[in-house]
Amino acid sequence: MVNPQHVFPPRRILVPSDMSDASESALKYARYFRERFGSEIRVLHAHNLELPPYFSSGQLADFKRELKRMEKAAREYVRKRSEPFLGFMPEIELVENTPAEAILNASQAHDMDMIIMGMHGRRGLQRLWMGSVTERVIRQSSLPVLAVRSAPPEKPVGRILCPMNASEPGKQALEYAAKISKTVSAHLTVLHVVEPGDAPLTCPLVDVQTKNSCNVEEIKLNGNAAKTIAEASNNLKPDVLIMGAERKSAVLGEFFSSTTSSIMQLAVGPLLIVPKKELNN
């Protein structure tokens, strides 16, 4: 079974906001989850102020007092900017920290079930892995992260694409996708890509229980996994692409597989990354 931390429908959702168009899109998706499932929404705004090294202790104390006076106004500003997109007055959290650290810390501190955040639409060299807060959060989060670029359609989750293999992350992603499909009556397409040299599967990708509980379709294609998944996503135009991911350790830190990383760069529509969780005994 999926680890209890991967709850769907999500009870509590964290929505980081930097007041950008992408953040507004994330707020609109959060509104859907609240109206559809009654999810609690917390909006997080992080700022990271680097003070000049020559500040004296007195100047630092004065600055902190001024910052405290400004906090109430800043909180109200974030609330007023968020309310039109959510349709209600959300819980607001202001944090002085780097955005990625603030998001990861808040998601754990408040026992969140999901993070919904915007992806800025940059491409090419401007969208290198470490250049995106969204990608850094996805890489390090232990929770499912829904990353979006634009506002949701009238029916936000009508078609789901879930690339699937026989690995544990793939199985967990499929189970999470099946939960969503069953809950919102969405069409679920399960895609398996056979790369050159792959051994044939010895068991069905989709179990009987999932087939009986969901509107599910299976597709098998040959080719490079990342490229084929990206092409299928562009052709099928799902409302959300759901992928499992397993972090691997290396000398330079943790990383995702090359397939997962490539899909994150190539994905056009909403992308929901489901991190691998160890199963409870």
Please tell me what each predicted stretch does.
Residues 1-9, 29, 42, 48-51, ...:
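Structural beta-alpha unit
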Residues 22, 123-124, 249-251:
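Short glycine-rich, flexible loops that bind phosphorylated cofactors or substrates
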Residues 132-151:
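Short, structured interface segments
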Residues 133, 141, 212-214, 267-268:
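Short, structured coil segments at secondary-structure junctions
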